[in-house]
Amino acid sequence: MNSFEKDWRFTRNSGKGFESAELDDSSWEKIDIPHDWAIAGPFSPDHDSEVIVDDPIEHTRKVFSHPGCTGGLPHVGKGFYRKHFELNLKPEQSARVEFDGIMSHAEVYCNGRYVGGRPYGYSSFALDLTPF
């Protein structure tokens, strides 16, 4: 059993081709997991404001802005994580990777090939890496 917590690469971007095994990720941020890129900031009420029209205290209808459900977390978008590793498996061995929780819409690639994913947020899942 190997720990995969150290020496990951991360970028926040909306490009394509990040699953490529040949992608140069040398400029990406070096991180360890667990990692939550949203809490790195910057924070602003403008990032997640919503209009509230009912004032339950004064029993009137007002329009005003206040930070919504994320408390002004930074821009919502896509984050990409990469991990470089080698497996030297014997024919009778297998390998799998376990995720304790990824925010949502996770897609996992190994050597440029789609392995699997999870559409739900912060739920654990495991994937078999043996064929890859």
Regions found by a protein language model. Name each.
Residues 1-61:
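Accessory carbohydrate-binding/adhesion or oligomerization-edge regions at the termini
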Residues 2-15, 36, 44, 71-132:
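Accessory beta-strand-rich segments of carbohydrate-active enzymes
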Residues 50-52, 66, 112:
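Charged interaction patches that mediate protein-protein contacts
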Residues 58-70:
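N-terminal glycine-rich cofactor-binding segment
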